[in-house]
Regions:
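N-terminal accessory/capping or targeting/presequence segment of soluble
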Residues: 1-110, 122, 126, 130-205
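Nucleotide donor/acceptor-binding cores
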Residues: 115-117
Length: 205
């Protein structure tokens, strides 16, 4: 049962109004951050803000007539409890017969739409493989993927800022190896692969 007094019901309706004003058919809200961190900073807890789900893995899709949370087996019970009264449906992943977000959008939400479909994503937090999967799911049909990383800023008035915590250096008594030694080994590895550089994006790496 959807509870009209539920704060998340109101937030989802606000997202839908914003979508209408921008000509967006569906918005995909990532539960990750630009570094694909398992535990993102408060600024990127967009899924929690919009539907109340606090699990570490989950993405939300909102259309004008459906809102759904995609999460895996670790969080099924938690999701059912936290989504109660929000009107957000639980879509289970990592199970036989799962329907991933791109397939659901193409084959269910907009199966009868042959005109252009506009999808909003946070391009900073979605990997290129996911964008490719979206495009492939729609095949020859027209789909516009809009990169709107700060779309919720218009609604999330007290959204936390990007963290500016000072960087600290851990001593060798904790790391077991100096920074220079690690960089030296990494450069030797790069040379051995005949590469010029390596891109490291995960914060814990």
């Amino acid at each position: 049962m959807i509870l009209e007094s539920n704060v998340y019901v109101r937030r989802i309706e606000a997202v839908r109004s914003l979508m209408s004003s921008k000509g967006i058919d569906a918005v995909i809200i990532s539960g990750s951050d630009p570094h694909a961190s398992e535990y993102p900073a408060s600024r990127w807890k967009q899924v929690e803000w919009v539907c109340g789900f606090t699990g570490e893995a989950g993405d939300v899709v909102i259309t004008q007539d459906h809102a759904g949370l995609w999460t895996d087996t670790r969080y099924f019970i938690q999701a059912e409890q936290q989504l109660a009264g929000t009107g957000v449906a639980l879509h289970k992943t990592r199970i036989p017969g799962e329907v991933r977000i791109p397939q659901w959008l193409a084959d269910y939400a907009f199966a009868d739409r042959w005109g252009s479909v506009a999808l909003a994503v946070d391009g900073l937090s979605q990997p290129v493989s996911f964008i490719n999967e979206l495009e492939n799911a729609f095949g020859c049909r027209q789909v516009r993927i809009l990169d709107l990383p700060d779309m919720l800023d218009d609604l999330w008035m007290d959204r936390p800022a990007v963290p500016a915590t000072p960087v600290i250096t851990l001593g060798e008594d904790l790391t077991g190896e100096s920074r220079l030694s690690k960089l030296g080994r990494l450069r030797s590895f790069i040379d051995g692969k005949n590469c010029d550089a390596i891109l490291v994006t995960a914060l814990d790496e």
